[in-house]
Amino acid sequence: MKALLYTGIGQLELKDVPEPSSDFIVKVLGCGICGTDLKTYQKGHHLFSPPAILGHEFYGLVEKAPIGCGYLAGDKVVVAPYAECGFCDVCIRGAGSLCANKHYVEGGAFCEKVGIASDYIEQGVFHIKELDDVYTLVEPLACVLNGFEQLDLKPTSRALVVGAGPMGALFALLFRAKGIPVGVVEPSAQRREKIASWGIEAFEPGGAGHVESPRAGRMESALTGQVESARPSRVEKGFYDIAIIAVNKKELVSEYIKFVADAGTVLMFSGLSSDEIVAIDAYSIHYRQVSLKGSFGYALRHFKEALSLIEAHKEMFLKIITHNYPLELGKEAFEMLASGEALKIVLRP
C-alpha cells in the first residue's frame, strides 16, 4: 500500500509499504495533519524515529472485521488514536488523559490502510453517520473538551483565546457555541479575517488593532439559544476572566497570568518542552487569586462527546478545515500548514 513516510527532519516520501496484517482493517479516507505531525516534520520528535508513518486524526471504511465484533466490511468509522485503561489510579480519579497504560492504534494513518488490534475495537472504534472530512476533527475537539473541563465556567465568563491555529479556533467556536463571549488574539491577518467571518472578535497581539466582527455586540448561543453580552472592541486587561494559551510560547503564559481578571484562569493548552521554565507572577496568583491550569490529550468520554457534537453541528465545525490534499502531495500540504496560510489540512489517500 502507499504511505507517506517521515524519513527525517524536513523529509516526507511516498513509499510502498506492507499492508497491515490485523484482523480488523480500516481503509483510510481522510486524516488531519496535527500540530505534533508538523512539529515532528520540522524538528523531529522523540516518539517518532524515521522512517515512520505519522497521522492519527482519521476516519474511513471497515475493510475487514472479525465475526461478532460489532462491525462489518463497509461500515463507516472514526477511530480514537488511543484509549485509557479505565482501571488505574488516575483513570479512577477521572483523569484518563493522563493514564500511563493507554492502548494505542497500531501505526499512523497517512497511508491507505490502518490495522486495529482485536482488543482495541470495542474501546476505540466508533460508527459514524456519513463519510466526511469533519470526522478528522473528533480527536482535536476531544482534546479541547478536556481543556474545557479544567475551566470553572460561569454565565458571566468571558474568554480570550491566544492563537488561532486549528486548536485555538476550535476553542473559539466552542466558546461561541456555548454563548460565552470570546475574543481571539492572533498575529496572522489572514487567520484574523477567518475568525472574524465566524462572528468572533479577532485582535492583533498587543491589542492595538482588531478585525470588526460582522456580528460584534450581542450574540446568540448555537447550543442554548440564549443571547449573551457584548464583546469589547479591543483587548482590555482585566476584561477576560479566562485565557486559553493555544501557542507553545512560555512568555505568553507569564503575560496572561497578569492579564486576566481577578479570580481568573489561565489554561496552558499548548505543550512546552520538559526543560522550559515559566516565570510566574506570584502577586497575581496570591493576591488576585488567578489560577494556572494545564490540559493534555483526552479521555474516551471526551472523544464520545466530541463525536456527538460534530454530528449535531457539522457545518459549524467544517469551518476549521480549509484545505485538503492527496497523499502524494503530502510534503506540499505540510509546507502549506507551516506557512500559516491554512487552518486545518486533511490528507486523502
Name what the model sees in each region:
Residues A3-P20, I33-E63, V78, I92-V105:
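N-terminal glycine-rich cofactor-binding segment
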Residues P20-C31, H45-F87, Y120, F126-K129:
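Glycine-rich beta-strand-centered segment in the early N-terminal region that forms part
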Residues G74, E130-E204:
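Mid-domain Rossmann-like dinucleotide-binding core that forms the NAD(H)/NADP(H) cofactor-binding site
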Residues C85-V162:
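NAD(P)H dinucleotide-binding glycine-rich loop of Rossmann-like/cofactor-binding domains
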Residues V161-A164, R176-E255:
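Adenosine-nucleotide cofactor-binding segment
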Residues G209, S254, L300-P349:
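C-terminal hydrophobic helical "lid"/dimerization subdomain
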Residues K250-A312, P349:
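Glycine-rich phosphate-binding loop and adjacent beta-alpha segment
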